[in-house]
Amino acid sequence: LGALVVTTTAAKGAIPETHPLSAGATLELEPTQRVLAAADIVLAVGSELAETSFWTSAASIRLGDQLIRVDIDPAQLVRSFRPDLAILGDAALTMAALTERLAGTPVTGAEERAARLWAENRAEHEVPETMNRCRMLNMLAEYLPENCFISLDSTQVAYTGASYFRIDHPNGWHFPNGFGTLGTGVPTAIGAKLGAPERPAMVIAGDG
């Protein structure tokens, strides 16, 4: 579609965050929320748009002049945010149909907006209170092998990394931000290795 893409933390890496149209899993950050509020249309695909994705109440969030939601579950189509248009269907099939229908429609400026938004959001983290976490995450990005599965406990590095660290492959970041469950990092990584033994795995553990 040629549009700027933002994901929830649960979908982190579903769209490679190194893609020029990606603005990462940054829904909780103020620069992204400004962009969403100013958008003509927000297309939400397969997302419950939960308060845990925004880290604030739904009442304080504005999702564009018009909101279109795509979901295979009728209940999810109206959860948290009531859309202007609800499309009940499989996400992959619906997006393929939309892409075909909109082929040739000129879209300009999205890559520049995504790059600018990445820079603004990273600046939100690169402040004295969180700079040490950013340094650690930048070192990990330099040395981690490709296609690595990262399993995280509910820890400050995870909170920062969810919107700061870039993942360029699906199922590469598992962080229990829904319930904030403690102690899931190691068992989740074990399960990931059992399911995909060819993939390297790393755990970031700790409380607080």
Give the residues covered by each predicted segment.
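Phosphate/pyrophosphate-binding active-site segments
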Residues: G64-S154
